[in-house]
Amino acid sequence: MYAIVKTGGKQYKVAEGDLVKVEKIEGEPGSAVALTPVLVVDGADLTSGDKLENVAVNAEIVEHVRGPKIRGMHYKNKTGYKRRWGHRQALTVLKITGIK
């Protein structure tokens, strides 16, 4: 069985036992979180829409990590202006423990 959940402005297809990297969620490693809203649940048949108001995906926070370095640069021609920047997104690794 799988479900599609929305967290951090993105949608993830998850199944029980999966490890998923999502946008940072506050909490200590080892604590439990419930992911809502659930958009789709697929068991014996496909379920979506208003029937999923009481459905949640339970997960456990495994660790907090940082994503890969993204580098960028601003450059203005003929003025000597250059600016380099970098960014590493804060991520949380979740282990999906159940879909209820």
Swiss-Prot record:
| Molecular function, one GO term | structural constituent of ribosome
Q: Does the keyword Transport apply?
A: no
InterPro entries, A to Z: bL21-like, bL21-like_sf, Ribosomal_bL21
Q: Membrane-spanning regions, if any?
A: none
**A Pfam family per the record:** Ribosomal_L21p
The reply on keyword Repressor is no
The UniProt entry's GO CC annotations, sorted and at most eight, read: cytoplasm; ribonucleoprotein complex; ribosome
State the UniProt keywords alphabetically: Ribonucleoprotein, Ribosomal protein, RNA-binding, rRNA-binding
GO biological process terms, semicolon-separated: translation
HAMAP family in the record, alphabetically?
Ribosomal_bL21
Q: How does it assemble?
A: Part of the 50S ribosomal subunit. Contacts protein L20.
Sum up the protein's function in the record's words. Answer: This protein binds to 23S rRNA in the presence of protein L20.
Q: Which family does it belong to?
A: Belongs to the bacterial ribosomal protein bL21 family.
This chain belongs to the protein called: Large ribosomal subunit protein bL21
This protein's species is Corynebacterium urealyticum (strain ATCC 43042 / DSM 7109)
Per the record, the gene is: rplU
